[in-house]
């Protein structure tokens, strides 16, 4: 069942203003129809990309209860209410013919109506007949049509947002071939819908708006929306508005007292600012987007709270360094000031990065702060780990200090995507932090820290390449495990290289020995005097022992 994002009583964001009892009844009939194949759209519409309404027509047989005209039809209708066939734009009671159409899954034989005690009214089993009825495109809801048309093996359209007369979709890639049909069906089936758009690109970090594609209806993006008892008017194509955040807006506003002061750093069109001002709070609101600023000023006037709000159109960093700084000096040092100070930072893609400007914001001032501002900063926590811990680490990283003694609350806001949640971290700006007395960790290469902190924990591509190179080198190193496995290919190669080195080393040593021996022989011949002739019988024998010793040494 598709869920829309207009606040309700039982199903959040269901888009239907109804009571608990009637909503449960609608759900009961919805699932009852889903369990009956005869009440499904024709199977032939599967894969349809251009809407053909006539292709949804089908004829089925269903049970009917024929009521005698002398009986009270209204009483019997009330008694048989749970057995009625309820479908979109189909009347189960035909007053002129005194005929009641029953659900084929609930009534298959006369005994199924035993609890109605029809015999006491002189109505017998002959009153139950099976007759054909014609079902058309108009008799199915949009979610039943999508279930019949879209691919059965892939995720169907699960949700959408309703902003005034605009239906805002965020179609996944596999649904894009069906976008025209989806837009037309939604425009046909949802009351007050005049425009259907699809988000075509991601939200721009500068102005928090996105490019959209018109799927069906009028290109009219001026809307009027009610939220938290306030009226907002804006051009949806130029500003950021998310109805899924209405509950979060309400939570923050309920924290505020009449005497409190609110600094809204990314005010948008005023979902925090306007209801806070209606409570009597003093609000300093800022937004960089000129269209958001214009809508903010207009919405303050529209809700008659302009006297409580000061609007600015500038960069959030400049707003912190000037307007917020000056206001903090005035309010935090004023002994007569009542109420608390709150700072909302609802720009989850980059709000945590602006926390770096708060430590030491008042370091050049010789003041004593009597108030500790409470910051509500929003961020995206990505990963499978504890999202609250990830959000806390993000805040501590950009704030440069531990927030254990400053932390008030870490709250889940909404799920954005698989393994990606929007979180709120509420913490106090202490006097030591604002005056620069708290030691702040230095961040190197801050421009490289823009991704989520947990992303930085993962090995970079450069590190992965280094690891691959080290692994390749490690493969050529002799290891004991290779010997155990019998893989001696690399071992043989290394051992043969070592043998060659040892042989070459021995040859060099032997050559040096020969050179030394040759030098000794030459020097002895040069220093020895000419020999005198001796008698033959007294001829001296050569000293062979020394020569043998030298030869043995060379061989060694």
UniProtKB/Swiss-Prot annotation:
GO terms for molecular function: tRNA (guanine(37)-N1)-methyltransferase activity; tRNA methyltransferase activity. It comes from Anopheles gambiae. Residues 444-465, 524-556 are annotated as: Disordered. GO terms for biological process: mitochondrial tRNA methylation; tRNA N1-guanine methylation. Residues 1-30 form a transit peptide. This is tRNA (guanine(37)-N(1))-methyltransferase. Gene3D superfamilies: Met-10+ protein-like domains, Vaccinia Virus protein VP39. S-adenosyl-L-methionine binds at residues 249, 287-288, 315-316, 346.
């Amino acid at each position: 069942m598709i869920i829309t994002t207009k606040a309700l009583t039982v199903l959040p964001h269901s888009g239907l203003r109804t009571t608990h009892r009637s909503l449960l009844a609608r759900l009961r009939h919805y699932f009852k129809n889903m369990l009956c194949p005869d009440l499904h759209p024709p199977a032939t519409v599967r894969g349809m990309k251009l809407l053909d309404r006539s292709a949804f027509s089908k004829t089925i047989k269903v049970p009917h209860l024929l009521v005698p005209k002398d009986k009270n039809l209204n009483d019997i209708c009330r008694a048989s209410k749970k057995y009625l066939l309820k479908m979109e734009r189909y009347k189960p009671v035909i007053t002129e013919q005194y005929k009641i159409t029953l659900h084929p899954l609930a009534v298959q034989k006369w005994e199924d109506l035993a609890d109605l005690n029809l015999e006491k009214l002189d109505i017998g089993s002959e009153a139950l007949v099976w007759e054909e009825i014609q079902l058309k495109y108009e008799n199915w809801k949009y979610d039943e049509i999508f279930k019949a048309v879209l691919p059965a093996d892939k995720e169907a359209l699960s949700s959408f947002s309703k902003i005034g007369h605009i239906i805002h979709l965020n179609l996944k890639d596999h649904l894009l071939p069906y976008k025209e049909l989806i837009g037309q069906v939604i425009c046909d089936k949802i009351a007050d819908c005049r425009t259907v758009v699809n988000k075509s690109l991601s939200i721009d970090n500068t102005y928090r708006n996105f490019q959209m594609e018109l799927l069906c209806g009028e290109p009219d993006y001026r809307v009027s929306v009610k939220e938290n008892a306030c009226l907002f008017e804006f051009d949806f194509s130029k500003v950021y508005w998310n109805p899924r955040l209405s509950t979060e807006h309400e939570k923050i506003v309920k924290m505020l007292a009449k005497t409190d002061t609110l600094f809204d750093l990314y005010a948008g069109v005023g979902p925090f600012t306007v209801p806070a001002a209606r409570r009597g709070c003093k609000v300093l609101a800022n937004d960089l987007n000129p269209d958001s600023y214009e809508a903010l000023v207009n919405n303050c006037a529209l809700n008659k709270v302009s006297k409580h709000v000061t609007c600015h159109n500038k960069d959030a960093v400049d707003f912190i360094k000037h307007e917020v700084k000056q206001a903090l000096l005035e309010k935090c040092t004023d002994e007569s000031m009542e109420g608390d100070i709150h700072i909302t930072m609802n720009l989850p893609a980059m709000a945590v990065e602006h926390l770096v400007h708060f430590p030491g914001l008042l370091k050049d001032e010789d003041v004593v702060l009597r108030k500790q501002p409470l910051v509500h900063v929003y961020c995206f926590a990505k990963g499978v780990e504890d999202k609250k811990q990830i959000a806390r680490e993000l805040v501590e990283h950009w704030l440069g200090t531990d927030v254990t003694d400053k932390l008030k609350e870490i709250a889940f806001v909404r799920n954005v995507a698989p393994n990606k949640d929007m979180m709120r971290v509420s913490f106090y700006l202490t006097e030591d932090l604002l005056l620069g007395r708290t030691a702040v960790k230095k961040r190197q290469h801050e421009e490289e820290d823009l991704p989520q902190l947990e992303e930085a924990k993962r090995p970079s591509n450069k590190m992965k390449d280094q690891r691959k190179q080290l692994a390749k080198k490690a493969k050529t190193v002799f290891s004991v495990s290779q010997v155990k496995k019998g893989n001696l290919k690399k071992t043989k190669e290394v051992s043969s290289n070592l043998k060659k080195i040892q042989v070459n080393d021995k040859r060099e040593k032997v050559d040096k020995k020969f050179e030394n021996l040759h030098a000794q022989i030459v020097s002895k011949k040069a220093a020895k005097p000419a020999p005198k002739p001796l008698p033959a019988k007294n001829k001296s024998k050569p000293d062979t022992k020394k020569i043998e010793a030298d030869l043995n040494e060379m061989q060694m």
